[in-house]
Amino acid sequence: ELSRYQLKTAVLEKELDVACGNSSRNTGMLHAGFTYKPGSLKAECAVEGNQEFDQVAKELGVPFKRTGKLVVGFTDHDRENILKYKAIGEQNGVKGMRMIDKDEINRIDPNAGGEFAMYVPSSGILDPMQYTIGLAENACQNGVRFHFGQKVTGITRDEAKDVWVVKTEQDTFETKWVINCAGMYASEISEMLGYPNYPVKGF
């Protein structure tokens, strides 16, 4: 996204190419946004990003298919939980969600099982590796410079120059802004910037 603006942008990557880490190792599922807290930034980004993704995939030349998603259930307890997700999705603006019975489940996906399900038509799938590469190629075409094999070892502040000094195993870079997108190593970069590291638990 930053490559669309008149900025001088560089990416420091410790690997020798893009798509060598977490970015290309996820499920490849485009989420609809029915699991995120209503009103949260994550919910807003998920729903808006979902709605825009057909155009994004087209611009990047990345294969993408809106397969829809089935959240299946068997018991009354399952139904109660699924209806909670449906309510969350409706608050977040997810369109087209509906409860379906076993016959309709079998028409959509005979292997899914379940006595009932929530059908979410806006979910989809893509190849996360191709998507990551597509984003990088697009950014490169727009003028972003990629520096590979550049593991960041330290970040300090130079107040006199009003810049951050980023040191890698090979070079030193000076920048007005640092964007931490280090995946599973993001906490290490945050600590270099002076932010405390604290553990969090997923759901």
Task: Locate the predicted segments by residue.
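Phosphate- and divalent-cation-binding pockets in alpha/beta enzyme and binding domains
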Residues: N81, E188-I189
